[in-house]
A protein has these predicted regions:
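Hydrophobic helical h-region of N-terminal Sec-dependent signal peptides
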Residues: 10-18
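Bacterial N-terminal signal peptides that target proteins for export
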Residues: 2-11
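Buried hydrophobic residues that stabilize the cores of well-folded domains
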Residues: 26-276
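Initiator methionine at the very start of the polypeptide chain
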Residues: 1-2, 32
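C-terminal motif of bacterial Sec signal peptides marking the signal peptidase cleavage site
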Residues: 20-23
């Protein structure tokens, strides 16, 4: 099992490293999908910040101008994991996230990267009867060795997610410590327009993990994954002390009611252009 694991990890790293050699100059010309809801690029005040590549309507890569890339990997047409390649002038920095189905409604998510390839951070995603992510548990930090998997540190938190069963959009996320004390609660509000990634195919169990992993982000490259039906307009957070803060997003739309420009009250005058 160990040999297979390390073989898989190294094979993935070498593969995406090879891809990176051909990707660094891809941003010179944005390749438009021509499909509303499948973004081709994000621009910050007119400057390219990320470009997107697809296989059909399945997202396959997010490329940054510096060469850093996030690769969405598939096996037999099914999403299987994420690989990261570093900026073009950086040798270290390859990483990976593997998704393994462990039960009818559970997935194990294992993530790690260089330089400590034998160390994994592991979470479990549990789905409800509608196939929507309901709970994400950080189970701990593990080291893979000759004797299998050894736990180095116990997980210390979990999150409960609430989705609208009709729109399948995230409405609430509550993060607790392992004694079930509430650490922070997030609530989410949306517009009524078509979502900026609404024609992009991504599994809900990936999206649930993504929302948990990037809950503190306001970078649109990560936040846009909330826009699978409509578009996020407000995220409110409340911590265990009762302190409340919020982030708001506004948009300009094209003739088909898809967002083409995004604004955030935390971006200090920056506007993000969305190209399809």
């Amino acid at each position: 099992i160990m040999n297979k694991l390390f073989s898989t990890i190294m094979s993935g790293i070498l593969t995406v490293a090879g891809l990176a050699l051909f990707s660094c100059s891809d941003n010179d010309d944005i390749k438009l999908t021509g499909i509303d809801g499948c973004p081709s690029a994000l621009l910050s005040n007119g400057q390219l910040t990320a470009s997107f590549t697809y296989d059909g309507n399945k997202l396959s890569r997010i490329q940054d101008p510096d060469g850093h890339a996030t690769h969405f990997n598939y096996e037999n047409g099914e999403f299987s994991g994420i690989s990261y390649t570093p900026p073009k002038d950086v040798a270290d920095g390859h990483g990976w996230v593997g998704f393994t189905k462990t039960g009818d409604n559970t997935f194990e998510v294992s993530r790690g990267g260089e330089p400590a390839l034998d160390i994994s951070y592991v979470e479990e995603v549990e789905l409800d009867t509608n196939g929507l992510p309901a709970k994400i548990t950080f189970t701990g930090i593990y080291r893979w060795g000759a004797n299998g998997k050894e736990q180095l540190e116990e997980g210390d938190r979990y999150a409960l997610l609430s989705f609208d069963p009709a729109t399948r959009q995230l409405l609430k996320q509550e993060v607790f410590d392992k004694e079930s004390n509430l650490l922070v609660k997030y609530t989410y509000e949306y517009d009524n327009a078509s979502g900026s990634i609404s024609h992009t195919e991504l599994p809900m169990w990936l999206l649930g993990w993504w929302y948990y992993q990037y809950s503190n982000q306001n970078d649109f490259k990560y936040i846009q994954f909330l826009n699978r039906r409509n578009n996020i307009t407000k995220i409110t957070s409340e911590n265990s002390e009762g302190d409340i803060s919020s982030v708001t997003y506004t948009y300009k739309y094209n003739e088909n009611n898809f967002p083409v420009t995004a604004f955030c009250d935390k971006w200090e005058g920056t506007e993000v252009g969305i190209r399809y």
